[in-house]
């Protein structure tokens, strides 16, 4: 795939997330893992998503839900807003805004999250995330041009 990487890094997919998703390399940072997970959502690679969730999450149980989401969700954009170290070298956080179109509801949506990552045995895993909710009168992050209270909050 000689196209731009879906993660919006500015690199080609082959030089960015592809080596991680194809298991030819391991992400060296939480940001690389987060970007590659976003790309996996875009290209609908459930195996990679499940493999990069923290083992205690038992993500395999969500396979059907993940696959169903692939059928109805079209990912539109990713903006990494902040990368922060955790309390030690084996933890970190990435704050991002991901935009998507939900074909079931026929509307735009977003995920604004501060994701938590940990490194176990030299490998980074996604643990969980804290959703960031905009103020009611703030512009809706989905890109509609409406206030949040008149758009995605409903």
Swiss-Prot record:
User: What domain of life is recorded for the organism?
Assistant: Bacteria
User: What Pfam families does the annotation carry?
Assistant: SEC-C, YchJ_M-like
InterPro entries, per database record: NTF2-like_dom_sf, SEC_C_motif, UPF0225, YchJ-like_M
Q: What SUPFAM superfamilies has UniProt attached to this entry?
A: NTF2-like, Sec-C motif
User: Gene3D superfamilies, from UniProt?
Assistant: 3.10.450.50
Q: Which NCBIfam families match?
A: PRK01617.1, PRK01752.1
UniProt lists the family membership as follows: Belongs to the UPF0225 family.
Put simply, this protein is called UPF0225 protein SG1365
> What species was this sequence derived from?
Sodalis glossinidius (strain morsitans)
